[in-house]
């Protein structure tokens, strides 16, 4: 499908007006009749459930958000969310109770949970590309770490972000095959020992900046963290499946412990960052690649299973920094969202029906977590 390429003499306002007045054909849409039929069936069922219940009864129905990895293509995530906000007419992030992020998706989630707006995050990314991405790889890790610390706090812990529930992915690469590890801002309502046994490993002592470094340490782009943690996108670039499993695990744990609390997913919004251009792998990195190829989960399979807002035509390198290239990428997002306006409106309708997350925060708080003893943060 041909893209609208902004002409030099056209103003941004005229370009948007032109886009609003276009007629979009079915051939221009991202369409799969089997997946769309399934999505429509689930959507109609959930709308029916929400219409039958009153506001109090809806308190256990939640919205969850999944944000893909992709380096500078975090700007794709922010632009997509801005376009959804344009339809919503209000802030989007406060509708979500549980958010999963990989790599740049973790950075976006952490920024929003810290109180930054989407526009502020876009300015952060523009500064990021100019300061962190130099002309050689791997890029300077010290500059990256300093940048994250200055933006989100050097002494802030992951647990200091109390709401929404956050789930960040990283890859533990000091084992073969490499293993997915999850970092959270919450624990299960049980003892420290049982939390550790079930994989909830000391996130309450983890600095936020270090959690983000672990999630975004893409091989050949940035060095590993503590000589073992690398980018979560190696195994789970789209963390939707991990997020779904996490919600189900929370329900199962509460059932096992006779805790009368469970949730039902009202809406899963999964936002991708486009496809990655193919690049030739240097011989020095072949052995590294062989370690990763054994992992069975790929982002593409997750997309097929779940369905997500995905900008297929965005093929920008993770460390791209050219202003023209970045501007075109963001314009492609705007065009894509206008083309799929009907889909966006359905998402907004479902989110509104479920409602904003603050009213459900008390529901989660009523199943209070076990409080650990004070400890020294992980530096």
Region locations from a protein language model:
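Conserved catalytic cores and adjacent C-terminal regulatory segments
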Residues: 2-379
